[in-house]
């Protein structure tokens, strides 16, 4: 079943009112890559789709499991066992039928960084758990002048008011 296409101005009018028409046009032309589409990445993807981003590349090799239900947007009973990138692709086109979605069922590793990121994206969101790969991606992106944001987990933390944002070089109490 395909979603009916409606005018972007109607579908994303709130985004235009918030950021302006010029920004909405830039969003529609943007290509954003999200690496890791689980607990953090699935929510980032949904926000990007609802903001009118025109092209999304999703990278993850994992499948949806019952244990994902408490924290992952795409974790629904009917989708258990489905590739996370495929489930999110289905959601994205329901939100923004004009969005082009590229699914890459793979885990990022130090070895495949050049192949996965050979062309620049407008922006990359790192939402993976593996510290070694996070560090390798950050190094690669800095060397290749690829704009990115690195997200960290807060597992086991119980006071979100204490979370602070900082440049990675100033972060403490984190394996990175």
Report the location of each language-model feature.
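Hydrophobic residues within alpha-helices
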Residues: 44-45, 88, 137
């Amino acid at each position: 079943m395909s979603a009916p296409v409606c005018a972007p101005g109607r579908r994303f009018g709130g985004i235009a009112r918030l950021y302006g028409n010029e920004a909405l046009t830039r969003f529609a032309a943007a290509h954003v890559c999200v690496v890791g589409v689980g607990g953090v990445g699935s929510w980032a993807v949904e926000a990007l789709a609802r903001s009118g981003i025109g092209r999304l590349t999703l990278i993850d090799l994992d499948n949806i499991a019952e244990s994902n239900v408490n924290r992952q947007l795409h974790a629904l009973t009917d989708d258990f066992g489905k590739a996370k990138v495929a489930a999110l692709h289905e959601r994205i086109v329901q939100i923004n039928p004009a969005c082009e979605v590229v699914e890459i069922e793979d885990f990022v590793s130090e070895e495949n960084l050049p192949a996965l990121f050979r062309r620049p994206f407008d922006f990359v969101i790192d939402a993976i758990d593996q510290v070694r790969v996070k560090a390798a991606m950050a190094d690669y992106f800095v060397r290749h002048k690829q704009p990115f944001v690195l997200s960290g987990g807060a597992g086991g933390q119980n006071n979100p008011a204490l979370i602070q944002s900082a440049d990675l070089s100033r972060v403490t109490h984190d394996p990175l």
